[in-house]
Amino acid sequence: MARFGTQKLYIDGGYVDAGSDATFEAINPATGEVLAHVQRATQADVEKAVESAERGQKIWAAMTAMQRSRILRRAVDILRERNDELAMLETLDTGKSYSETRYVDIVTGADVLEYYAGLVPAIEGEQIPLRESSFVYTRREPLGVTVGIGAWNYPIQIALWKSAPALAAGNAMIFKPSEVTSLTTLKLAEIYTEAGLPDGVFNVLTGSGREVGTWLTEHPRIEKVSFTGGTTTGKKVMASASSSSLKEVTMELGGKSPLIICADADLDKAADIAMMANFYSSGQVCTNGTRVFIPAQMKAAFEAKIAERVARIRAGNPEDENTNFGPLVSFQHMESVLGYIAKGKQEGARVLCGGERLTEGDFAKGAFVAPTVFTDCTDDMTIVKEEIFGPVMSILTYETEEEVIRRANDTEYGLAAGVCTNDITRAHRIIHKLEAGICWINAWGESPAEMPVGGYKQSGVGRENGISSLAQYTRIKSVQVELGGYSSVF
């Protein structure tokens, strides 16, 4: 019997059975254990969720800003009280180390919710004078029922990133988590209800993107879709959302981000940054800086520092807080990553570290891939051009600043970029020329609630987090008021 039994849908403030008996398995990628049987939503369930969300949204939007803010703050408190429990569930479901989920996933998700809870009373319109007897005022009104579609790498954090601004602005949200990692999002729905959110304002439908996701994106009474995932799927979601009813969309998609290390950089610090940009969360982060550019004359010294740090990685049971490198999210994804590693070897890249599946002892039960570093890479290699979404670093050399900027930008993606240098002028000069939406100087990876995140080119549309995201969950109504007489031309 599965450890967590059968997981139902969450609609209208409670768990309900799906309209069919179909389920899918939630699997612990560290051991292969079946954690739960998760029900698949039907099209009829989607209709129930939309109707429930419409009812709840009217109640929610009619509350005062302070009432909504207090409920969201209460949810923040509950998230923090249950942090360790939720973190362990996230570890079991995703394979991410508990040392990561305990201090990052729920913590940063709660921070975003707290940030938007504080902004609820700040949603304001404007007053625009026209003449002595007339003025215009604007209202920022909620969109209505919105949809969030999450990725498998940060399940509860992404659910909070999407629901926080949506709910703060007075909307309802129907959330569809990834089929691979659905469990913590259902717990989030419980927490919202416990905090006092009206029934229906946050519903969770589990199932495949091909079915449930499409039913949601095509639904005529959904006003906005926020999607996190791959670029190919994102294009389909965007086409579906726009062709059905011209929905607004936010897309956080793939990346193949460059990390440029300059000749004057502190090489130890640069190596530490490169490690975080490639191996945190076992390399399953959309913003990973997998193309590491190093001046040719510094390549050997940099390789030595990277190899030394890779040797210190503590791969193992993700439930052990001493572990800092767990398995990949699924056995299917492991095969995809191993395929890219094989391609890298075939195309002539040299393996500096790793390059294989970990199979010794308990590793054999899980989807573990060794932290892998390729060097002697060229821009035309598959591992350099395509998003792998795993623990695979590619080291490339360059000669001039102009050259490395051109090569860094030579990609269909534009999600993130970073520069390591002690020259502040050079740092800003390079960053301003890089075609990426999220950039770091002498750092990598932090995405605080206040920081808008999103991509250029085929890495996304719109932004999440920051004040600008809140505006994307409202629409402006303009009202002209005439205090004096009115003249007709007829």
UniProtKB/Swiss-Prot annotation:
InterPro entries membership: Ald_DH/histidinol_DH, Ald_DH_C, Ald_DH_CS_CYS, Ald_DH_CS_GLU, Ald_DH_N, Aldehyde_DH_dom, BADH
Cofactor needs: K(+)
Protein's GO biological process: glycine betaine biosynthetic process from choline
Known EC number: 1.2.1.8
PROSITE patterns for the chain: ALDEHYDE_DEHYDR_CYS, ALDEHYDE_DEHYDR_GLU
Keyword NADP: yes
Catalytic activity, as annotated: betaine aldehyde + NAD(+) + H2O = glycine betaine + NADH + 2 H(+)
Details of cofactor binding: Binds 2 potassium ions per subunit.
Site label Seems to be a necessary countercharge to the potassium cations, positions: 248
Record-annotated active site: 162 (charge relay system), 252 (proton acceptor), 286 (nucleophile), 464 (charge relay system)
MF-aspect GO terms: betaine-aldehyde dehydrogenase (NAD+) activity; metal ion binding
Keywords of this entry: Metal-binding, NAD, NADP, Oxidation, Oxidoreductase, Potassium
HAMAP family recorded: BADH
Role played: Involved in the biosynthesis of the osmoprotectant glycine betaine. Catalyzes the irreversible oxidation of betaine aldehyde to the corresponding acid.
The protein, known as: Betaine aldehyde dehydrogenase
Gene: betB
